[in-house]
Amino acid sequence: MTALLDTFVSKIIENSDYAELDATYLSNRILALVGEDNAQQDTNQSNLIALKDELVDLAVVNGKVGDLAEEKDCLGAELMNFITPIPSQVNKAFWDTNAKSPQKAIKDFYELSKRNNYIKVTAIAKNIAFTTSSVYGDIDITINLSKPEKDPKAIAAAKLAKTSNYPKCQLCMENEGYQGRINYPARANHRIIRMNLGDEKWGFQYSPYAYFNEHCIFLNTEHVPMVISQNTFRQLLDIVDIFPGYFAGSNSDLPIVGGSILSHNHYQGGRHIFPMEIAELDSVFRFKDFPDVTAGIVKWPMSVIRLRGANKYSLVELAEIIRLAWRNYSDDTMNILAFTGDTPHHTVTPIARKRDGQFELDIVLRDNHTTAEYPDGVYHPHIDVQHIKKENIGLIEVMGLAILPPRLKKELAEVEKYVLNQYNEMADYHKDWADAIKASHPETSSETVSEIVKQAVGRTFVRVLEDAGVYKRNRQGQAAFMRFVESIGVK
């Protein structure tokens, strides 16, 4: 056993630029935050984040912070800020190291973001993840449990909290070092790497609740809305040049087919191989005037044109030609509608990579028009699969990684009981699906039911992606896809 405060101070010195001479100063600053009573109580913890959690709990007892998770997070971030260098130092270290080894610069910043608990490693470990097979290859499924559900008391407190427009959104630069409040996340330990993309100033940070390895965000330093343009393709390819081993992609810039934040232009990236990346090409061709670019249609439930070549300027120019062609392309025979009046329905979800010295750009065609039959969107998960996924299909899911809601953890356990003919409290909206599982697997046992239900979830998610695909994976749909490609001009 060691004394809590002393142990935490020792860990700060071990993980920062502070020295032993600073120990008294650090102790006093921490006491000011958590209170003096029982600060030297015994602890058997040696992990920095676990020690931080004990100090936060002590602060609650001492009346220095409220008991709501949001209040404790604000204090926790402030305590972890002791091991986090100031932004200018973080940026200098990153770019100094980057000049010698980009890989090491990325690794160092990633490790800092985990060490200071900005990336919620413990929370992320709660996610349920598994892989299911499909005709398109393996599909990755996750049930997202990392973000804690809101406490009713916190919801009530947030309603009473003073409204604020600062920061404007959670992707703004003003989040760096922000204290946080009952209705806004703590960011005292948050750091952003400054960078240039062309003539624009951008930032690079990690996602606190990562969905995959080294999940990061690239954000415009100005609060400007999402827009897909030729500049988007240029910037994505620049990113994969600057960050070796990372992909970079953008959500679409229209509702229904876009991401959850359309108000602030940003991209996502990371060090992860998604199922779509390794999917085969159904066909290979070249576009006129672009002999240095190989193109093809990807064997994937969504409609993807893959461009590949060593000259990124050619890829940027061709991608913009495809985007503009798609923006104005309609096909009544396939229920593909570019405009309703002056309202545009067509955009793309672009993803960039660099592999073996070649640049790759996947252009995923998107259509957000609605009808009386499909009020949520013709190319949105249809009603019969919304019991599994009803939210927008964004960048990450387009690539074959399902991010399913936390409710499914309990709900799928009840489905398993139903399939086994046991007492259950299964939600009614799963019944047709669960009946189909029972009918196709009469031999199900307690040993096999979990895997059977997981595979059924995977098949349903594939259907979700097929619903979001503009050109369906049948002969008629693929012929129509080639008509669009040929309208641009192929050799």
Swiss-Prot record:
Keywords: Carbohydrate metabolism, Cytoplasm, Galactose metabolism, Nucleotidyltransferase, Transferase. Its main location: cytoplasm. It is found in: Cytoplasm. It comes from the Bacteria. GO terms for molecular function: UDP-glucose:hexose-1-phosphate uridylyltransferase activity. GO terms for cellular component: cytoplasm. Pathway: Carbohydrate metabolism; galactose metabolism. It catalyses: alpha-D-galactose 1-phosphate + UDP-alpha-D-glucose = alpha-D-glucose 1-phosphate + UDP-alpha-D-galactose. InterPro entries: GalP_uridyl_Trfase_II, GalP_uridyl_Trfase_II_CS, GalP_Utransf_C, GalP_Utransf_N. GO terms for biological process: galactose metabolic process. It is an enzyme of class 2 (transferase). Its EC number is 2.7.7.12. Belongs to the galactose-1-phosphate uridylyltransferase type 2 family. This is Galactose-1-phosphate uridylyltransferase. It comes from Streptococcus mutans serotype c (strain ATCC 700610 / UA159). The gene is galT.
